[in-house]
Design a protein with these regions (language model features):
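N-terminal capping segments
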Residues: 1-64
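...with weaker cross-activation on analogous glycine-rich loops/strands in unrelated enzymes
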Residues: 55-126
Length: 140
């Protein structure tokens, strides 16, 4: 299996696990759970995500990791790349409500994750303007 085929297979497995699930702090349906599952599909052994049931709980867990933001947390585990270098299966961060949102990059500005205009986890095709808001990208 080529590197690209492996990335596509991991991204499809992540999509199958999360697509259609509404965002839910208490049911482990958040972007950090999405990223951790995806990283495992890509062969990374990340620590388990402790249980949290609210945005406040998530903030406390970030502080316990010595970071304030999700991009800072990603910097601890993955090499940062320019958004233009993203391949299928890489991680992207975009501004969100209260937190930055982490998404899995597909192709042609399509990302898997939760979006303010969607009720559940889905593939979001970003406009050029939306894509330009990318706050960070990481090679998985």
């Amino acid at each position: 299996m080529t590197e690209l085929e492996r990335r596509v297979a991991a991204t499809q497995a992540t999509q199958a696990r999360f697509k259609g699930k509404p965002f839910d702090w208490a049911k482990q349906a958040t972007c950090i759970h999405l990223v951790r599952f995806h990283a495992a599909q890509m062969g990374h052994a990340l620590p388990l995500v402790p249980r949290f049931r609210s945005a406040l709980g998530a903030k406390k867990l970030l502080a316990e990791q010595g970071v304030e933001t999700l991009p800072e947390l990603m910097d601890k585990y993955f090499p940062r790349i320019a958004p233009a270098q993203m391949l299928v299966g890489d991680i992207a961060a975009f501004p969100g409500e209260g937190f930055d949102a982490l998404m899995i990059y597909g192709q042609l500005r399509a990302c898997l994750g939760w979006h303010q205009d969607a009720d559940d986890c889905q593939i979001v095709r970003l406009s050029e303007e939306g894509y330009s808001l990318c706050k960070g990208a990481w090679r998985v």
